[in-house]
């Protein structure tokens, strides 16, 4: 497969598998959430605040998302969607090997000694993709517009009280 065909296949996979669902900020409209094109695949935006929430909500079995659909709250704490653009704050300095390790083993940033990715990242599904598909996705993501956005670190469950409403 040519490089151009591989990038097109990667774009198709990224769009149909649902990467934009979590990794692209949305604006809420009368028709529901709409992707903010200029922030596509850049993850949860650095500096964005989270709305207040009652930690009891999580203790009672609920999970929540913020309005941009890039922050997720559950028993694991708060996780933020990663920047997967070609910028160095995204996957710009990743190798194919790191990408495959992240997708196949769920290792954060493809670091074999690092922690596991947090929910709702469905890496177990991506682990089933063949090499050609993962390579095409990686080539497409590396071809995207670089968006500088250092996504915040997750908030552990022990700090959910910091999100309480006033």
Where are these regions (language model features)?
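Mid-length scaffold segments of soluble, non-membrane domains
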Residues: 77-94, 98
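Active-site micro-motifs of SAM-dependent methyltransferase domains
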Residues: 21, 29, 86
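Generic anion/oxyanion-binding catalytic loop in active/binding sites
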Residues: 8-11, 88, 123-126
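C-type cytochrome heme c attachment motif
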Residues: 12-24, 98-104, 135-139
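Secondary-structure boundary elements
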Residues: 2, 16, 143-147
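Flexible coil segments in periplasmic/lumen-exposed cytochrome c-class electron-transfer proteins
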Residues: 24-79, 96, 108-166
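Electrostatic cytochrome c docking/interface patches
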Residues: 1-15, 27-29, 33, 49-52, ...
């Amino acid at each position: 497969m040519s490089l151009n065909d591989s990038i097109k296949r990667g774009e198709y996979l990224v769009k149909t598998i649902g990467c934009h669902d979590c990794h692209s900020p949305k604006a809420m409209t009368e028709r529901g959430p709409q992707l903010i094109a200029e922030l596509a695949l850049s993850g949860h935006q650095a500096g964005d605040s989270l709305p207040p929430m009652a930690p009891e909500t999580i203790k009672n079995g609920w999970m929540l998302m913020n309005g941009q659909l890039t922050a997720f709250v559950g028993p694991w704490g708060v996780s933020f969607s990663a920047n997967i653009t070609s910028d160095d704050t995204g996957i710009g300095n990743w190798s194919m090997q790191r990408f495959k390790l992240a997708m196949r083993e769920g290792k954060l940033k493809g670091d074999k000694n690092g922690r596991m990715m947090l929910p709702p990242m469905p890496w177990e599904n991506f682990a089933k993709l063949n090499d050609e598909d993962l390579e095409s996705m990686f080539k497409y993501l590396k071809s995207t517009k670089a968006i500088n956005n250092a996504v915040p670190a997750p908030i552990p469950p022990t700090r959910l009280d910091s999100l309480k409403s006033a």
